[in-house]
From Swiss-Prot:
One of its GO terms (molecular function) is DNA binding. InterPro entries: DNA_clamp_sf, Pr_cel_nuc_antig, Pr_cel_nuc_antig_C, Pr_cel_nuc_antig_CS, Pr_cel_nuc_antig_N. Belongs to the PCNA family. Its main location: nucleus. GO terms for cellular component: PCNA complex. Keywords: DNA replication, DNA-binding, Nucleus. Residues 61-80 bind DNA. Pfam families: PCNA_C, PCNA_N. It comes from the Eukaryota. This protein is an auxiliary protein of DNA polymerase delta and is involved in the control of eukaryotic DNA replication by increasing the polymerase's processibility during elongation of the leading strand. GO terms for biological process: leading strand elongation; mismatch repair; regulation of DNA replication; translesion synthesis. It is found in: Nucleus. This is Proliferating cell nuclear antigen. It comes from Nicotiana tabacum (Common tobacco).
């Protein structure tokens, strides 16, 4: 038997909105410690890892480990029926091929039940190795989102370079080039508005902007975003979910073929 009750129901809605365009079908894994998901996008370029720890739920019962295959677009449609202030409860009986979503209004005067069929999804669980990153940038999530959006009106890819001067986002396209530099800024009154750069060695990597723009759909979940970079490793774009866990997006860097050819 599985029963999860989340008072902050809007949180689950935001999680689904942030991943439903990237991943079509995925398994939600429930264990005694939490509710998690790990899935690749359809083109196998990006990976998303979600964790909601059990202690973040008002009530969390998971008698045995269970994996629930769901179509994320359908799940998002169901969650759209919940009000932003609603309490959301997820229920699944052992061996059942359905999951029930229950939405309760805060005043308890309206309760809605939605039942959704589960799917059988074959998915290999990818071990994500713990890595030491050359550079870690923490910045306001809204600022990162704006940068990705602005640069995609110029080009398709972004070069993210971290030096001791700051972090630089650059792109080039048919109409010209654009460079945006964010310097370390820790003197702000509110910690969530700070830009903090930890760098062991300079790093410069190229990424597809359409994926980064997709990742920024998680902006409503957190005021800050952490970007971890290392040569030849996927970038990790992490949004912490208040007191509960995180959503992490991994994206492999693009190898610049043109540059490879012009090297002596």
């Amino acid at each position: 038997m599985l029963e999860l009750r989340l008072v902050q129901g809007s949180l689950l809605k935001k999680v689904l909105e942030s991943i439903k365009d990237l991943v079509n079908d995925a398994n939600f894994d429930c264990s005694a410690t939490g509710f998690s998901l790990q899935a690749m996008d359809s083109s196998h370029v990006a990976l998303v890892a979600l964790l909601l720890r059990s202690e973040g739920f008002e009530h969390y019962r998971c008698d045995r480990n269970i994996s629930m295959g769901m179509n994320l677009a359908n799940m998002a449609k169901m969650l759209k029926c919940a009000g932003n202030d609603d309490i959301i409860t997820l229920k699944a009986d052992d061996g059942s091929d359905t999951v029930t979503f229950m939405f309760e209004s805060p005043t308890q005067d309206k309760i809605a039940d939605f039942e959704m069929k589960l799917m059988d999804i074959d998915s290999e669980h990818l071990g994500i190795p713990e890595a030491e990153y050359h550079a870690i940038v923490r910045m306001p999530s809204a600022e990162f989102s704006r940068i990705c959006k602005d640069l995609s009106s110029i080009g398709d890819t972004v070069v993210i370079s971290v030096t001791k001067e700051g972090v630089k986002f650059s792109t080039r396209g048919d109409i010209g080039t654009a460079n945006i530099v964010c310097r370390q800024n820790t003197t702000v009154d509110k910690p969530e508005e700070a830009t903090v750069i930890e760098m062991n060695e300079p790093v410069s990597l190229t990424f597809a902007l359409r994926y980064l723009n997709s990742f920024t759909k998680a902006t409503p979940l957190s005021n800050t975003v952490t970007i971890s970079l290392s040569s030849e490793l996927p970038v990790v774009v992490e949004y912490k979910i208040a007191e509960m866990g995180y959503i992490r997006f991994y994206l492999a860097p693009k190898i610049e073929e043109d540059e490879e050819e012009t090297k002596p």
